Amino acid sequence: MAKLDAYFGEYGGQYVPQILVPALDQLEQAFIDAQADPEFRSEFMTLLQEYAGRPTALTLTRNLTKGTKTKLYLKREDLLHGGAHKTNQVLGQALLAKRMGKQEIIAETGAGQHGVATALACALLGLKCRVYMGAKDVERQSPNVFRMKLMGAEVIPVHSGSSTLKDACNEALRDWSATYEDAHYLLGTAAGPHPFPTIVRDFQRMIGEETKNQILAREGRLPDAVIACVGGGSNAIGMFADFIEEESVRLIGVEPAGKGIDTDQHGAPLKHGKTGIFFGMKAPLMQDENGQVEESYSVSAGLDFPSVGPQHAHLNAIGRAEYDNVTDDEALEAFQLIARKEGIIAALESSHALAHAVKMAHDDPEKEQLLVVNLSGRGDKDIFSVHDILKEKGAL
């Protein structure tokens, strides 16, 4: 029986209760079989094109890098049906679940984008859907909560722990432990127990594949760097995957520095965490001196995660990708900047990557460079929270 690698270097693996091992084995084999089946691939690609709206545009910014020699392109995952890159892999996993004969889908969500994507895929494919969401996130993402309910999903607020994404993840896994015979756990990021990091990456890798073709058609060469925000890491690994072998292309992931890396309110485990076991995997993790999981923090709910996908950890360890961080204030500034300069309302998550790219351009205005930012989602979900933050700062 064919098997996928469970580890990326020392990271990854399958640290789960024994009861879940058969379910994960079944999922791995189903994924291997599906990837080898032209009919499955064809149905997936048809849904991406005709339902989700792929390929997404590659947009050259007109004003963000004025006064510099940088050309900055945006990969427009915000234009995808559902409003973010999440729709790509959700359609893939939902098709896989149907192929496995599952009737129900369990999901977790932070910003609500994965929950919305899961709800729309379940509505389309006739699957029952329940979504676990931290109670804090339910409050700060009420438009997405209503969207999910509108599409027939049951939204279950999680009040344990910090009432955020990590707690929703734990509850979703607990549910799956009891229901895996009928239910598929549709994990929302390129993290968690094997084979999820590989499945999610492969169902997101068209982001980088399209970007490569589009930039070659437009510029006749590969970019100097591709830049993406990193929470769990699915939009970033989707962008990076097709460029890993292209050694001339820098892969830059941007973690949330929150209120500052020197505070305890950030979400940057790659640079400031220690290796631990969390969410069924071995990965960098924000921990206190006793090894307890620390609460992460970010202004963007989708980056508020105390760990990171194992492939990012490996790419960081071997020096193939580099990871920096951006504070809440810098992301908020970029959120406003792209709206004013380009007429695009970007997600707060994506605004972290954008802030880093704009800084790269203006730090060295004479340097000729070709940059691509993965604009992973649109910011409609964030306008109310940003309005309140700016009002509080007296910036409105």
Curated annotation (Swiss-Prot):
One Pfam family per UniProt: PALP
Alphabetized UniProt keyword annotations: Amino-acid biosynthesis, Aromatic amino acid biosynthesis, Lyase, Pyridoxal phosphate, Tryptophan biosynthesis
Record's GO cellular component terms: cytoplasm
Cofactors (names): pyridoxal 5'-phosphate
Membrane-spanning intervals of the chain: none
PROSITE patterns given in the database record: TRP_SYNTHASE_BETA (PS00168)
Biological function: The beta subunit is responsible for the synthesis of L-tryptophan from indole and L-serine.
Subunit relationships: Tetramer of two alpha and two beta chains.
Name of the protein described by the UniProt record: Tryptophan synthase beta chain
Organism whose genome encodes this protein: Vibrio atlanticus (strain LGP32)
Gene symbol of the encoding locus: trpB
